[in-house]
């Protein structure tokens, strides 16, 4: 039986997939038994898989068929140390970015979808997309010593501002 935390995380991944399915009108689904099948030490498995199979094991969400370059990792936690973002180092976020980028390929749009109890839903994307993606008026920029600079904004606001741009860039 899965732990309460794992069940909570799986629910968030399903929520993200359902939201994107509704937004784009194509199926987005949670990766079954999501984990690092092709990430980290398992990256060698990519050499034996088709592009469609690789897409099915990247991140936590299998994107719709017209989004081959979209890589989404989902995290749902009780709390998050937001103060560490402005203090310059957030080990928790760096760990999640490690997980996200481990299975990423060059040219992917890498998105970290986060949800925290009583705080809301957030999304992080790499700053080099800022010319293409909009961040709106309220956002946080976080510089990771390992993964460069990321923009963190409200989850729903990101998709409202950038749904067309994501589709164009993820093909």
Regions found by a protein language model. Name each.
Residues 1-48:
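Acidic-basic catalytic patches of nuclease active cores, encompassing PD-(D/E)XK
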Residues 22, 66, 86:
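Positively charged, solvent-exposed patches that mediate nucleic-acid binding
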Residues 55, 76, 96-99:
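Phosphate/NTP-binding elements of NTP-utilizing enzymes
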Residues 57-73, 79:
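Active-site beta-strand-loop-beta-strand hairpin of nuclease catalytic cores
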Residues 74-91:
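Short beta-strand-loop-alpha-helix junction that forms the active-site gateway
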Residues 87-101:
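Basic, flexible Lys/Arg- and Gly-enriched helix-loop patches that mediate nucleic-acid binding at interfaces
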Residues 104-132:
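Nucleic-acid nuclease catalytic cores
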Residues 128-171:
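Intrinsically disordered, low-complexity terminal regions enriched in charged/polar residues
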């Amino acid at each position: 039986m899965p732990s309460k935390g794992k069940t909570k995380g799986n629910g968030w991944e399903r929520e993200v997939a359902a939201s994107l399915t509704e937004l784009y009108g194509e199926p987005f689904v949670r990766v079954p038994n999501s984990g690092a099948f092709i990430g980290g030490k398992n990256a060698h498995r990519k050499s034996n898989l088709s592009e469609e199979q690789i897409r099915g094991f990247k991140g936590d969400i299998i994107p719709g068929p017209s989004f081959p370059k979209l890589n989404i990792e989902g995290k749902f936690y009780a709390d998050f140390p937001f103060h560490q973002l402005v203090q310059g180092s957030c080990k928790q976020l760096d760990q999640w970015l490690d997980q996200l980028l481990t299975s990423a390929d060059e040219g992917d749009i890498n998105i970290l979808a986060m949800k925290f109890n009583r705080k809301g839903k957030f999304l992080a994307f790499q700053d080099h997309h800022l010319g293409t993606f909009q961040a709106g008026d309220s956002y946080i920029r976080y510089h990771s010593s390992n993964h460069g600079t990321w923009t963190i904004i409200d989850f729903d606001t990101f998709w409202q501002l950038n749904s067309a741009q994501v589709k164009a860039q993820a093909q």
